[in-house]
Amino acid sequence: MAPPVRPGMLPLLLLLLLPPLGSVPGVWSFSELFFMKEPQDATVTRKDPVFLDCQAHGEGPIKVTWLKNGAKLSENKRIQVLSNGSLYISEAEGRRGEQSDEGFYQCLAVNKYGAILSQKAHLTLSTISAFEVHPVSTEVPEGGVARFSCKISSTPPAVITWEFNRTALPMTMDSRVTALPSGVLQIYDAGPEDAGKYRCVAATHAHKRKSMEASLTIVPANETRSFYMPTIIASPQNVTASLHQTVVLECMATGYPKPIISWSRLDHKSIDVFNTRVLGNGNLIISDVKLQHAGVYVCRATTPGTRNFTVAMATLTVLAPPSFVEWPESLTRPRAGTARFVCQAEGIPSPKMSWLKNGRRIHSNGRIKMYNSKLVINQIIPEDDAIYQCMAENSQGSVLSRARLTVVMSEDRPSAPYNVHAETMSSSAILLAWERPLYNSDKVIAYSVHYMKAEGLNNEEYQVVLGNDTTHYIIDDLEPDSNYTFYIVAYMPMGASQMSDHVTQNTLEDVPLRPPEISLTSRSPTDILISWLPIPAKYRRGQVVLYRLSFRLSTENSIQVVELPGTVHEYLLEGLEPDSVYLVRITAATRVGLGESSVWTSHRTPKATSVKAPKSPELHLEPLNCTTISVRWLQDTEDPAAIRGYKLFYKEEGQQEHGPIFLDTGDLLYTLSGLDPRRKYHVRLLAYNNLEDGYQADQTVSTPGCVSVRDRMVPPPPPPHHLYAKANTSSSIFLHWRRPAFTTAQVINYTIRCNPVGLQNASLVLYLQTSETHMLVQGLEPNTKYEFAVRLHVDQLSSPWSPVVYHTTLPEAPTGPPVGVKVTLIEDDTALVSWKPPDGPETVVTRYTILYASRKAWIAGEWQVLHREGAITMALLENLVAGNVYIVKISASNEVGEGPFPNSVELAVLPKDASESNQRPKRLDSSDAKVYSGYYHLDQKSMTGIAVGVGIALTCILICVLILIYRSKARKSSASKTTQSGTQPLSRASASVAAGSDMGKNLERATENEESSVPMMPSCFIDAKGGTDLIINSYGPIIKNNPKKKWRFFQDTKKIKVEQTQRRITQTVCFYQPGTTVLISDEDSPSSPGQTTSFPRPFGPTTLDTEHSANSEGSHETGDSGRFSHESNDEIHLSSVISSTPPTSNSLTCGDSDGDAAPKKHGDPAQPLPAEQTSAPQPTPAGLRHAAESVPV
């Protein structure tokens, strides 16, 4: 919870901008409202008229009303308020119940600035009582001393005189006879003339009373007197007097010779000689008593000429009415500020301080607090603009002082937040939400949330200040099952809004904070009566609906449970074993659940043979204060067993037992003192006789904390500050805070509150105590966010909670290894390892460690280590050596620690052939893949992905081919324009083709470094079932309108006759120039049959370039961009040549320029060619076939 702040500091700038209040007319007018005359104490006789003065002065109009004993006094014919404000009572009535006029009167003066209340005036009627003490007859020897006294109560104090034989004694007599104002008559050196009857007369201005008579008898003395020590027969008595009264301290002594009486002060101060005198033979009279006269006076009777003396002492207490030593000062404060009035008074006895607002008493509650002599008003509102009075009163009178609070309002202040509503979240938290002010909401810089208990008086109001970016707040640290009142205030730089509407919300119930305190007694050897008191409301936290009793024999482990309704407070266990120790405990439950169980309380059942044993007493325990417990008991009057006494035992919970304390049979009360505050004590009591101990009674009780009334009025100390939290482990957090510099107290204790964020059950909140400014909080959940707060305790006072600090515990170290570890060889020397995070949703991984090594390195303990971040679940293992088997294992870790390694995974790297040791490693072909398929860890998901990808790629290629074919039909008409006739004979082309046989060898060498992934297809199967009429050269596709045609590559038009009726292909030549594609059929020739046709040469001369780009050392041609780069060894470059190698049995050939036969379609007749057009058939090189298959369209 945010700390309580003082929002009154927010608009402090406003005070600097305000004009001097003295320049504002009428602002200080309230100072004119004061009393010129106030009512004074008065004593009158019944039926006498009464005048009580009250004259107020100030800005008119001024209205004066009267209060009697704090209530408004109604006017009638007998009681009237005069025009000057005085009260007139025509005939005083007394001692007739409500008709009595006796009491305390005050006048209240009101004008437009406020109201002030006068001091109290006590009106009493003159009365006199009967004599409380009458003179007593006495007999003294001649020459001795005689003393008579009487006592009477009256209002006003009566004047007492004496009569001798019904004749008044003069007020001033010789030194032998002294009449004291207190009602004492002293006679020294009594003689026969003093014998007679004496009585006292008490008189006031309205009454007179006479006491009974007392006789003085003088006995003749012996002729000779013996010496005897001085004796004080009437010592001074303690006296309490008011200021300006007269005090008499009597001191009368006898002895022989006659003692000398002297006075002194016990504090060795000198006695005031101006107001003090000795009356008679040693009585001290102090007139016009003042405070400095108070003290202890010592009367000393000394035998003359000796050191023999005797003393007597008495204390003089002087009472004084209250008087101010510090007066409250008028204040001017802005809206929502804080006002503090200070008022100090002194008097004897100490005056009681109270505060008035416009004449009405203020009660400390919510935002208005009274601490001893201070009045603090928080969150000032316009209604706080008033006149405040500090009243100090004691038995001697009352006095008041006034001050004005002026509230300055800002015209541009925001309106109040509205639509405030509260929602209960848990037993200790309530969600408060509101809407922004409708007016000037854009200028709001902060909100303050105020809350306090809705029931009771003197409730503390708490305040939390929030930023302007939120309109809701969760108030926690509330008491369960309690009503709270909330309101909101909005702040801006120049002031604050009015308070929002108040809302009240109740927290949920919670489990009881502590169990009931039980009492155990036995009525027979086989039963135990269990009784308990209801849990106090502050610990109950709801309505108790169930009690659960658990009991067992101390020698057994089985527990028996009895559940009782919440309205039951005792239960009798019957059928128990005699002379056995039973353990009993109790648990209380609300509607939420069961609370904490009490500790096991032991009780021994009586012996079965204890027929004459005394019954158990009825025990009652009551804490008198924080260190004392009153133990009371009653014995059964019907118990026939004799009782010799009682034995009392007690112990603090968890400590060793004290006792027995032996008590007499007449003792029914004992006080245990010297206990510790806030401790639970177990007390047991039993009666005993000469035979044995009786049945015992057991009961537990808790001592309260030592908090006095004076302490309750002291403001609470500030909370600890700079609270700091740091996670230590996954189950502990270290806290550190600073002690506030508010006191020099040496003993300070702290309470730490700890709970997970969002906790719904307040009973799960952890409270820890320490006297240090740091603590390691243990037993927390891993990877959980907690909130912490600290409060301090000093001199039985507790501070508010410090601001809440949030911190998260560290996660646990991974308890399991990564799962699903897979290793895939993706290159000859590179493998891909993948895995999944360890099982468990709470596992947090920040790093993975990959260890891998060959078998030899593994045996030597030499691992290669890789690290990956926690979000990465794959890694590449590079620079693997062929022919080795590698061991791979992975572990997960975080900032707390390292997890375990799983079982190792092995990877075999494909060995190389000796013939290929100096070449690049080859990829596995299909047959090799079967042999080493065991080393490929491809799961079903991987295979499915590959198949889907290949299918998509083939579909795209097919769509592209269809699009090209469709678009080529529109461009057939342009083919004739792009084809040029050639004049060179076919022999030149044949020669060029023949020259390509040498280059075919180079091509074969080039293809040795290429991968072979699919079986080769001869070029004659390129279009086995016919094709389209598409002709492509370097200028683009050539489209012919002839729907029936045959494709030829480089046809010899000089010697081959085209016969359309037979549709026979006379010659087909396969040729590919990198970067150039030319497809020609015999029907597509632009020349007539027999005409020589010349094709353009896109690159270089007419001779075919059969050099493979991968193995070419150079070119005799002026190379161009049609060739692939000679520097790239990773690409596959293809060329089409016509081979002159003799055919083999495994080779498939197409017709060429020198072949004897050409392949025929089904149904075409054979047609021999001229000899000059044939040549030895050449097998197609594998590389050439591959290239032919790989030519893009």
Swiss-Prot record:
Residues 974-1018, 1078-1193 are annotated as: Disordered. SMART domains: FN3, IG, IGc2. Its main location: membrane. The keyword tRNA-binding does not apply. GO terms for biological process: cell-cell adhesion; negative regulation of neurogenesis. Residues 966-1193 are cytoplasmic. May play a role in anteroposterior axis elongation. This is Protogenin. It comes from Rattus norvegicus (Rat).
